[in-house]
């Protein structure tokens, strides 16, 4: 019986042929014999590499148009055999022991993303034999090295060079772990796709579908980040590979320093906020909060008005537009303030040339046709567990509103109320936003009491010498006491929009009537923590 620790035979069956030519040549140079499924053997042959067709070993052909290639007991015996215990069986049936199994699967994920393929075609991309062989090899890791990723090939060659064609048990266990994770992710992608396609789920089970009893979400590392929220924290960016989730940041960095954890967090908020508006709009984001949002005739004016909401807070912020950015606005930004990031659906060549002079400034182009509000769930980690909730970006429906005051809001106040809600829903609680003519006049956010948020919003407006006459105020949650209404009455604010729901709602409404302020109940709270 030969020493199974020394690599003698390798089985290869790959859909992704990346690096396989170089790897195969390295194996052959070490006098290692290659076995391969028909397609892989033909690919290697075209590149002047000989591999024995696995059917010559099994004496059984591939059948059913290739659906059955490796589902044969002789192949599994080659992989699952334990020489010390199975010596007689190995000799009796002339079993060739496979020391390395190199397998990757049919590209199901790629097929499932192809909108031109029918369900029946996509089903054909579900690999059966590949995952089965990988699991078998991983189970017998003490005797077999299983390799599922092309980027691992060179590390195997390096170890064999150092150890006379022997792979350590430590490496085998490591690769077996990677293999089981690979099969898990593969099966989960299939499950997520078929779940999405399943039309038999009753409408009343929407909650169970969104928040099932067992939740499996796969993430793949996209890139390491320089650090987390603070320099002492490590951080990476992972993308969600599960097919039942639609939230993705479709962005392209055109210039500037590498994106940080805080940058990406604020970009997420910036895209969510700007996607609320159809008309030309600019928003400025700072530390997880909008600090200025304005709609205007053009980018130049929208930026000016958004910036004037809070020039101090805008310093070092992220600026986002929903229209193509030209050189006029680019010059104004550079002249006006320091910014970490500028986002827009596109930039003119003249604007790019202006930003080129600021090489550290991050310029981000995003896909304007993607719905950045259309992600299914929010996830928060709590000591190893997670909290999961459906996202809060519900459509603002004025048909659900109740005008609870004697004074009715006019058309401008209704429009400003809608605008205000599109901003306040993205602010950290407790939050108050003041709006006039679809421009943020002032913002008070992240306070532990509603009256403090109200005081800050009014103070900032007064400090900037901005009149609050005919201004609309939006609150992310109800007013628990009438003290905020008393304060608001002295400012010139004429309309309040809030969800309602306090046990003191009647008292709050009476105060609004007392001060001749119109009040709208939306029945929709927007807490954000």
UniProtKB/Swiss-Prot annotation:
CC per GO annotation: cytosol
Domain remark in the UniProt entry: The IMP cyclohydrolase activity resides in the N-terminal region.
SMART domains reported for this sequence: AICARFT_IMPCHas, MGS
Record's keyword terms, sorted: Hydrolase, Multifunctional enzyme, Purine biosynthesis, Transferase
Name of the featured protein: Bifunctional purine biosynthesis protein PurH
PANTHER family linked to this entry: BIFUNCTIONAL PURINE BIOSYNTHESIS PROTEIN ATIC, BIFUNCTIONAL PURINE BIOSYNTHESIS PROTEIN PURH
Pfam families cross-referenced by the UniProt entry: AICARFT_IMPCHas (PF01808), MGS (PF02142)
Organism: Buchnera aphidicola subsp. Baizongia pistaciae (strain Bp)
Reactions catalysed, as given in the entry: (6R)-10-formyltetrahydrofolate + 5-amino-1-(5-phospho-beta-D-ribosyl)imidazole-4-carboxamide = 5-formamido-1-(5-phospho-D-ribosyl)imidazole-4-carboxamide + (6S)-5,6,7,8-tetrahydrofolate; IMP + H2O = 5-formamido-1-(5-phospho-D-ribosyl)imidazole-4-carboxamide
Cystine pairs: none
Record NCBIfam families: PRK00881.1, purH
